[in-house]
UniProtKB/Swiss-Prot annotation:
Residues that, per the record, bind L-aspartate: 131, 135-136
Family note: Belongs to the argininosuccinate synthase family. Type 2 subfamily.
Reactions mediated catalytically: L-citrulline + L-aspartate + ATP = 2-(N(omega)-L-arginino)succinate + AMP + diphosphate + H(+)
Subunit annotation: Homotetramer.
UniProt-recorded name of the protein: Argininosuccinate synthase
Binding-site list for ATP: 17-25, 43, 129, 131, 136, 194
Annotated EC: 6.3.4.5
GO MF annotations in UniProt: argininosuccinate synthase activity; ATP binding; protein homodimerization activity
Binding annotation for L-citrulline: 99, 135, 139, 192, 201, 203, 280
Annotated coiled-coil segments of the chain: none
GO CC entries: cytoplasm
InterPro entries, A to Z: Arg_succ_synth_type2_subfam (IPR023437), Arginosuc_syn_C (IPR048268), Arginosuc_syn_N (IPR048267), Arginosuc_synth (IPR001518), Arginosuc_synth_CS (IPR018223), Arginosuc_synth_type_1_subfam (IPR023434), AS_cat/multimer_dom_body (IPR024074), AS_multimer_C_tail (IPR024073)
SUPFAM superfamilies for this protein: Adenine nucleotide alpha hydrolases-like, Argininosuccinate synthetase, C-terminal domain
Annotated source species: Dickeya dadantii (strain 3937) (Erwinia chrysanthemi (strain 3937))
Length: 449
């Protein structure tokens, strides 16, 4: 039996993820007028561009919501964000700049917490504003059904009746006005923005064209670091972790993770830290482009990875990066709570994050320009005395190194023979492409005789 309802279920309760914007306002009012019983649920994700959350449920009731609830998701959102940092769960990077999966993290929290609230109210039909071309429609679908196995999905934007009547923003605005609501359509921007307290996403419209750069974006979490008229003085900041968890900024200890992240956002935002331009692969394999902000996540990530490289050995770091990228892709696909993701999270948090205790001092300048000034940890395996170039007591002697190099003769000989075989078969040409002049030592011995 299908879980997706193509037409409005008249007379039934429908929970709508209500943002208070034009789209969800018009959808809620339309559903009520057509005979459904809408319930509105708003997630408080600490969006930097939202200044009055309490007003949103009130507006929902004015538009016909049977009930409207504001669900505080900030604590859970920050917990998932810190888990992502601990695991390095980020797979989209361009030129060393990272996308911190802030929208996928927000969807994981929203999709589970709102549906759980609906279930408490006996609401088993859910609608949201995601479109059929994007990632969110699948993320919300997965998280919703994971939370409530009896859930049915109704999306006005998949209903041809709704689209025929209110297919565009102009039609929605006129509908609100003729229904007696003085709803003023916000000014059209050159792009759309979606945000939570972990980060902001700017995409679509003009940003679909690659000749439209970051310079058309007005940051909501940072500053226009590319604008020479914006003064951004350098700033030192110290970040402290205990067992993989960020606990202090500039010597100030935080007992509330939400407040710590807000302060990290303020510090990083003053410099435009964590802003990136990414071309990515959506779940449906089509490529899209986005401009992202995540100043606090970037600050914590930089300090965390500095400690990772100073504490763990090479093989552990390699596994951290490999599994982190794999986990990041699962997160992006809406599989953050799937068994394969939980397995990776557990391993990375248990064996990598648990050892990350220490303090990193950075100097932040403009954008992603920064320097690491100091790294302090009792767990560091970086010990300069082991490799010092100065005369003194050493953990190994010249004779020890001679023995170690002699043991390399075995694999050097094997490699030389393999290279000769490749030359003989025509796979490579001796002396080309930076390869050494390769000769078969056995043939050389015969010619010498």
């Amino acid at each position: 039996m299908t879980t997706i309802l193509k037409h409005l279920p008249v007379g039934q309760r429908i929970g709508i993820a209500f943002s208070g914007g034009l789209d969800t306002s018009a959808a809620l009012l339309w559903m009520r007028q057509k005979g459904a019983v809408p319930y509105a649920y708003t997630a408080n994700l600490g969006q930097p561009d939202e200044d009055d959350y309490d007003a949103i449920p009130r507006r929902a009731k004015e538009y016909g919501a049977e009930n409207a609830r504001l669900i505080d998701c900030r604590k859970q959102l920050v917990a998932e964000g810190i888990a992502a940092i601990q695991c390095g769960a980020f797979h989209n990077t361009t030129g060393g700049m990272t996308y911190f999966n802030t929208t996928p993290l927000g969807r994981a929290v929203t999709g589970t917490m709102l549906v759980a609230a609906m279930k408490e109210d006996g609401v088993n039909i859910w609608g949201d504003g995601s479109t059929y071309k994007g990632n969110d429609i699948e993320r919300f679908y997965r998280y919703g059904l994971l939370t409530n196995a009896e859930l049915k999905i109704y999306k006005p934007w998949l209903d041809t009746d709704f689209i025929d009547e209110l297919g565009g923003r102009q039609e929605m605005s006129e509908f609100m006005t003729t229904s007696g609501f003085d709803y003023k359509m916000s000014a059209e921007k050159a792009y759309s923005t979606d945000s939570n307290m972990l980060g902001a996403t700017h995409e679509a419209k003009d940003l679909e064209f690659l000749n439209s750069s970051v310079k058309i974006v007005n940051p909501i979490m940072g500053v226009k670091f590319w604008d020479e008229n914006v003064r951004i003085p350098a700033e030192e900041v110290t970040v402290r972790f205990e067992r993989g968890h960020p606990v202090a900024l500039n010597g100030q200890t935080f007992s509330d993770d939400v407040e710590l992240l807000l302060e990290a956002n303020r510090i990083g935002g003053r410099h435009g830290l964590g802003m990136s331009d990414q071309i990515e692969n959506r779940i449906i394999e089509a490529k899209s482009r986005g401009i992202y902000e995540a100043p606090g996540m970037a600050l914590l990530h930089i300090a965390y990875e500095r400690l990772v490289t100073g504490i763990h050995n090479e093989d552990t770091i390699e596994q951290y990066h490999a599994h982190g990228r794999q986990l990041g892709r699962l997160l992006y696909q809406g599989r953050w709570f799937d068994p394969q993701a939980l397995m990776l999270r557990d391993a990375l948090q248990r064996w990598v994050a648990s050892e990350i205790t220490g303090e990193v001092t950075l100097e932040l300048r403009r954008g992603n320009d920064y320097s690491i000034l100091n790294t302090v940890s009792d767990n560091l395996t970086y010990k300069p005395e082991r490799l010092t170039m100065e005369k003194g007591e050493s953990v190994f002697s010249p004779d020890d190194r001679i023995g170690q190099l002699t043991m390399r003769n075995l694999d050097i000989t094997d490699t030389r023979e393999k290279l000769f075989n490749y030359v003989e078969s025509g796979l490579i040409f001796s002396g080309n492409a930076g390869l050494p002049q390769v000769a078969n030592p056995s043939l050389q011995d015969k010619s010498a005789k």
